[in-house]
Structure formats: structure tokens, C-alpha cells
Amino acid sequence: MDKLIKTISESGSFRAYALDSTETVRTAQEKHNTLSSSTVALGRTLIANQILAANQKGDSKITVKVIGNGSFGHIISVADTKGHVKGYIQNPGVDIKKTATGEVLVGPFMGQGQFVSIIDYGTGNPYTSSTPLISGEIGEDFAYYLTESEQTPSAVGLNVLLDKEDKVKVAGGFMLQVLPGASEEEIARYEKRIQEMPAISTLLESDDHIEALLNAIYGDEPFKRLSEEELSFECDCSRERFENALLTLGKDELQAIKDEDHGAEIVCQFCQTKYEFSEADLEELIND
């Protein structure tokens, strides 16, 4: 089971989250049949949203949209505060690597665009904010969003590593945030450690990458573990939800679908589950 560890420095001036999202991203790859670059881009977006959701209180729903003008199109993710996340990428078939190293490329194919966050607190007035994409690598764009939009200086590292068959090997990351009251001396120490930190891909290769991430963030500084939360890819779609969507079309449109197509098939964008509605099903909806 994937998990996210919340921590805070002994001084109370820094908080850090470290997470293992391997099964989450693996499930997303299997459901959407994504190729290498699309897998990494979608995976990074899911991890960013898992972090963002962990930062929320109450029963909120968080939508992250990474909207670029490159090959990927847009990437959409929806998370809740219970550790569930779902998502999809408009173009699942991007598969581009550096010839010399085999490194999967993301940034150049995200293009220019926006990192958008929509937080729905359940009150009917969702809060939307956005920042421009600064690199298209998603992790850097997420850190920029946190610093600029949420006014919290943040360092973020997240990645998805693939095996030789381009299947998800490991996925995860971290977020470090400066809290009010941090001294300049403390900030300088943490900045130095982040700058000298091994590459996120190297840390993810560790036997226990959550511990490796926390050790890299805190060094010898004492910190407290606040909580451990389970994470998973989970879609909340249902036949009932799509029945309600069909009802919004109106009886005339449903009759036309019944007469012309003799039924309907709806595919959930987030998990690719197919829902079949026969002529009899449509007739029942028409007569509802």
C-alpha cells in the first residue's frame, strides 16, 4: 500500500511530506495503457495532487489541471483528503527518450501553459488559482505554484522511474515547506541540504525511499513524525452517476440515441471503465 508520511522539524519551523506512490502510478499506467513519457507526466501530476490533498483539512476535493500546448495535451487529476486520487492524460501515447541515456523526456513536450488548482470545500464556492508552467517538468511547476499562489516557500521533488519494459518501477517524492518563525540561519541550513541532495531518481532507488528522502531533507536535525496516511488510485465513478448524466440529455435526445444507436456505451475518462446501456435501459430512463 502506498503511503505518505507527515513530519515537522523539532523547532516547528519546517514541515516535510515524503511519499511512496508506486502502486498509485502503476494502477494509472495499467488503466490508461500509457507509454513512457505519458506515464511519467501523469504520474508526477498524481503525486503532486496527493501532496496538495494532504495539505488540506476537512472533506475537500482537489482538482489539479496541468494544461500545456505540447504533445501531452492536458493532464487532469482529482484527489480527496482520504488519500484517494484519480487522473488521466489527454494523450497517453507519448514515448520519447534521450538517445544517449534513455532518459524519459517530459518538460519539452508539456509546452507552455498553466498549473491550475481547484479546491472544493463542499460549500458550493470552489477556490481556483493558477500559475504559469515554468519548465513543464511538473515538480518544478508545482513548487512554483506553492510558493507563488499559496505564499509558502516550498521545495518539491517527485518522479516516476520505469523498468526496461517501461513499466512503473517506483514512484514518489517529497515536499518541504518553510513555516512562519523560521530563522534565516535555519533557512540557510535547509536550503544548503536541498541544493546538495542527491537526485530524486537516486533517492527513489533506495531500499526504503521514504526514509532516504527524510534523511536527505533533515540531515542530523531532529524531527517529529506526525502521521502516516494510506494512498491509492481510486475512481468513484458508478453506473448510477452515468445514468444521471444521461438523464440530463433530455427525453428527446435519449429517444434519438435509442432509435439510431440502439444503446449507449460510456467510458469513464479517469479509469476507462465501460458502462453499457441497452435499448431497454434507455427506454427505462425515458419513462422515468
UniProtKB/Swiss-Prot annotation:
Gene3D superfamilies from the UniProt entry: Hsp33 domain, HSP33 redox switch-like
A Pfam family: HSP33
Source species, domain of life: Bacteria
GO biological process terms, semicolon-separated: protein refolding
Subcellular location: Cytoplasm
Record PTM text: Under oxidizing conditions two disulfide bonds are formed involving the reactive cysteines. Under reducing conditions zinc is bound to the reactive cysteines and the protein is inactive.
Disulphide bond pairs: 235-237, 268-271
Keywords: Chaperone, Cytoplasm, Disulfide bond, Redox-active center, Zinc
GO cellular component, one term: cytoplasm
GO molecular function: protein folding chaperone; unfolded protein binding
Family membership: Belongs to the HSP33 family.
The protein's role, per its UniProt record: Redox regulated molecular chaperone. Protects both thermally unfolding and oxidatively damaged proteins from irreversible aggregation. Plays an important role in the bacterial defense system toward oxidative stress.
Protein name: 33 kDa chaperonin
Source organism: Streptococcus thermophilus (strain CNRZ 1066)
